Amino acid sequence: MDILKLSDFIGNTLIVSLTEDRILVGSLVAVDAQMNLLLDHVEERMGSSSRMMGLVSVPRRSVKTIMIDKPVLQELTANKVELMANIV
């Protein structure tokens, strides 16, 4: 999977687990040079409760894991491989 960079996931929904046992689900808008994330349309899940948060900046140091649906990952990988094969 080292063919993809985090910036390749912009526009896709990510599931981000944070150090405070919180989970954020939102669409990746941007990644800065320090690998901080900007997510939009974010739903925060904590235990059995959840809330909508809108646009959220996520510091890299608070991220434990980042997940994406497998079919989306496979499609992104296939698109990137095809794009790289067509570069002259």
From Swiss-Prot:
Sm domain sequence ranges: 1-72
A GO MF label: mRNA binding
Q: Name one Pfam family in it.
A: LSM
Entry-linked InterPro entries: LSM_dom_sf (IPR010920), LSMD1_Sm (IPR034110), Sm (IPR047575), Sm_dom_euk/arc (IPR001163)
Q: Which domain of life is it from?
A: Eukaryota
Gene Ontology CC terms: cytosol; NatC complex; precatalytic spliceosome; U4/U6 x U5 tri-snRNP complex; U6 snRNP
Q: Gene3D superfamilies, alphabetically? A: 2.30.30.100
* Oligomer status and interactors: Component of the N-terminal acetyltransferase C (NatC) complex, composed of the catalytic subunit Naa30/MAK3, a large auxiliary subunit Naa35/MAK10 and a small auxiliary subunit Naa38/MAK31.
Q: What does this protein do?
A: Component of the NatC N-terminal acetyltransferase, which associates with the ribosome to acetylate nascent protein chains in a cotranslational manner. NatC acetylates protein N-termini starting with methionine, followed by a hydrophobic or amphipathic amino acid, with amino acids at positions 3 and 4 also contributing to NatC recognition. The first 4 amino acids of cognate substrates are recognized at the Naa30/MAK3-Naa35/MAK10 interface.
Which miscellaneous remark does the UniProt record hold? Answer: Present with 2140 molecules/cell in log phase SD medium.
Its name, as the record gives it, is N-alpha-acetyltransferase 38, NatC auxiliary subunit
Q: Which gene encodes it?
A: MAK31
